[in-house]
Amino acid sequence: MENTANDNQKHLNSSSAWVMVSLMMVAYIFSFVDRYILGLLIEPIKADLNLTDTQIGLLLGPAFAIFYATMGLPLGYMADRFKRTTIVSIGIFVWSLATAASGFAQKFWHLFIARMMVGVGEATLSPCALSIINDSFPAEKRGRPIGLYTTGMSIGPACAYLAGAAVLTWTNSAGLINIPVLGDMAPWQLAF
């Protein structure tokens, strides 16, 4: 009985825990938007950057996936030893910066490196989120928060498809757009 009492004391109060889960779900939604948006915008990107099918394949697959998968292990290790909210915050900053950098890509390698960094940044989220949920809820009450968090995996692609459709519609009707300080940008660049 004493272990159960100690275990319950380490959990956050209910409202703080649910706020944390909700924030992580929103981050998960954005992570999936970032993953899917490239695939939807690939035709205008391919045309503007003069990319080959092989380069497109590398951007859609290995550039993100290899780094996302391989960084998950060391980041999971770090999540067990360091402050998880700090790790996730740094990860969100890295992937947001890398996503924005995707919009400034002028060559294949620019976009490839940006996608690699998106993978590295996004790899922080799930190990930390699941660990935070584990710490924030007793074992018998973890199903709902994990379920809420993982809904981001379905909502994110839906949001990406909606945003991608809007950008593709815009791309077909707009030429270059002059942004003060940044100069001329294609509509696909603004999607990032």
Write out the residue ranges for each language-model feature.
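Conserved MFS/SLC helix-loop-helix module at the cytosolic interface between two early adjacent transmembrane helices
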Residues: T70-W109
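Helix-loop-helix hairpin linking two adjacent transmembrane segments in secondary transporters
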Residues: Y149, M153-F192
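Residue-level signature of mid-helix packing/kink "hotspots" within the transmembrane helices
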Residues: F32, Y36, F64-L73, A123, ...
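Cytosolic juxtamembrane N-terminal segment immediately preceding the first transmembrane helix
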Residues: M1-V33
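Helix-breaking motifs and short loop linkers at transmembrane-helix boundaries and internal kinks
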Residues: N50, K83, F104-H110, G121, ...
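Extracellular/periplasmic helix-loop-helix junction of adjacent transmembrane segments
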Residues: L41-T70
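Cytoplasmic helix-loop-helix junction between adjacent transmembrane helices
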Residues: I113-M153
